[in-house]
Amino acid sequence: MAPGEKIKAKIKKNLPVTGPQAPNIKELMQWYCLNTNTHGCRRIVVSRGRLRRLLWILFTLTAVALIFWQCALLISSFYTVSVSIKVHFQKLDFPAVTICNINPYKYSAVRHLLADLEQETRAALKTLYGFSEITSRKRREAQSWSSVRKGTDPKFLNLAPLMAFEKGDTGKARDFFTGRKRKVNARIIHKASDVMHIHNSKEVVGFQLCSNDTSDCAVYTFSSGVNAIQEWYKLHYMNIMAQVSQEKKINMSYSADELLVTCFFDGVSCDARNFTLFHHPMYGNCYTFNNRQNETILSTSMGGSEFGLQVILYINEEEYNPFLVSSTGAKVIIHRQDEYPFVEDVGTEIETAMATSIGMHLTESFKLSDPYSQCTEDWSDVQITNIYNATYSLQICLHSCFQAKMVENCGCAQYSQPLPRGADYCNYQQHPNWMYCYYQLHQAFVREELGCQSVCKEACSFKEWTLTTSLAQWPSEVSEKWLLSILTWDQSQQIKKKLNKTDLAKLLIFYKDLNQRSIMENPANSIEQLLSNIGGQLGLWMSCSVVCVIEIIEVFFIDSLSIIARHQWHKAKGWWARRRAPACPEAPRAPQGRDNPSLDIDDDLPTFTSALSLPPAPGSQVPGTPPPRYNTLRLERAFSSQLTDTQTTFPH
């Protein structure tokens, strides 16, 4: 072999092993682990210590298994072209239905309690409008009965005087009882008006409320005289009814047999036994159908009006309070079985002499809690005491919060809400300042100054029924005569008069279809997607994987911190050893640098050959050690053969 070829063969032999040219599998695997970009395999080879090497083997094999699993799922999903469609019909639970008469109590049962209030109300109406109310025989009797007290001082008008202001001049007002003008020193608070307005648009009607010492007063005005008088009447009405026991109020209201004339559900007859009494402070006796306190929850398997709830209600217009309510009919609210029916807030009114059809669509919503939204899954994270015997809702929280503020600031509870534990309802005798306190607190609540709106949260899961209401005249002119005659005969035990169509109302509640709409919130970025996105970015830009991240943690955190700690430990040990060692005399300093006359700093640094020819420093002695035996040096095995072929013999 030529000398050049021999040299090339020697160099090639000593170069790193490449792939298939490796002499055996062990060296091939060693070469792969040292040169691959798969960091885990490299860490298996270069790691020192059996435990660390074993951990890297475990991490790498786990990562390989996960890669095969994920790739198999992706390939299987790619080649799957079939689709699966499920059509599922099921029975839907029928909601609870609460029905109330708009008039809470029979007028004949409560007129003796409200006689003085009605007398002063009629006097105020006569002063404002200049007319006296013409009523039926029963109401004329009540009016003549209350006129006996004509010579007495007005009780309710003194507590909260009704006044009429001229627009633009709030310093003087006309008193409703005396008809005279008087000076008013009070804050004017204007309440939003409804539809009706007084005949003289130049006047604004309101009533005055003062604190105990009458030093602080406020006048609440309405641009509608009807609204002002009804609000004033309602305020005193709540004060009177708050002093009546619950048992007496239930007896003064309508029974289930009186309110419900006929009942059908899902084509099957029902009666008052299928309804549960619910007494509302402002609506009297209400009755709830399909309440689970009675029996199991009813369900329906078909949509349409024939498979829902059908009832005929007896309204009894003659027993209506003329000042408390100005319309006739009933209120109905659809809700869950464990939910409190807020009749005054979300109730639907039912007209008399009409058939009201309510079609329902069920929507079930599920929201994500913190940190995605400010909703609550239960009452645990809301610092408000639940005064309702029902599950959590935003309305329950707001009303409970206001009632708690009412008890805290006014010393009593507001009549239209449930009574908190240990509190009493407000009334004049025990709490003479409650009216003024209530209105002041209500204004602060509307302006969101009580903090209730910030504390209360929406519920994360709830059911909602979307209602579609339609009306039809009922009964028709051709069927009115025979239908009313039969209903009068059927209800002769409960109703002692002949029925007319203005006393009745028909109600139909049903599912329009059995499709349930579900709205569910899911995180837009889950933890799996987050890890996938981060891994994709690391792999794209840095060729890094989970194993690479573990390697970085090992090198830059574990090993680096260990080295720093070891260095600091040795440094501290050296400092402590020097401190404890005895002081030694300092050796004379040898001439170096510019002190050495043999060194010229302007010249270039000497090479190894030129350094041997430099003269020794002054005063230095050449050591007497004999020169080394150069033939005893041993070179690396990898270069021994090369030196044999290429070395040149120099003469000694």
Curated annotation (Swiss-Prot):
Annotated site (Cleavage): R140, E141, K183, V184
Species: Bos taurus
Protein's name according to its UniProt entry: Epithelial sodium channel subunit gamma
GO molecular function terms noted in the UniProt entry: ligand-gated sodium channel activity
GN (gene name): SCNN1G
Annotated segments matching region Gating release of inhibition by proteolysis (GRIP): 137-224
A GO CC term attached to the entry: sodium channel complex
Function of the protein: This is one of the three pore-forming subunits of the heterotrimeric epithelial sodium channel (ENaC), a critical regulator of sodium balance and fluid homeostasis. ENaC operates in epithelial tissues, where it mediates the electrodiffusion of sodium ions from extracellular fluid through the apical membrane of cells, with water following osmotically. It plays a key role in maintaining sodium homeostasis through electrogenic sodium reabsorption in the kidneys. Additionally, ENaC is essential for airway surface liquid homeostasis, which is crucial for proper mucus clearance.
Maturation and modification: Phosphorylated on serine and threonine residues. Aldosterone and insulin increase the basal level of phosphorylation.
Membrane topology: Multi-pass membrane protein
Record-stated family: Belongs to the amiloride-sensitive sodium channel (TC 1.A.6) family. SCNN1G subfamily.
Keywords, alphabetical: Cell membrane, Disulfide bond, Glycoprotein, Ion channel, Ion transport, Membrane, Phosphoprotein, Sodium, Sodium channel, Sodium transport, Transmembrane, Transmembrane helix, Transport, Ubl conjugation
PY motif, short sequence motif: residues: 626-630
Catalytic reactions of this protein: Na(+)(in) = Na(+)(out)
Domain of life: Eukaryota
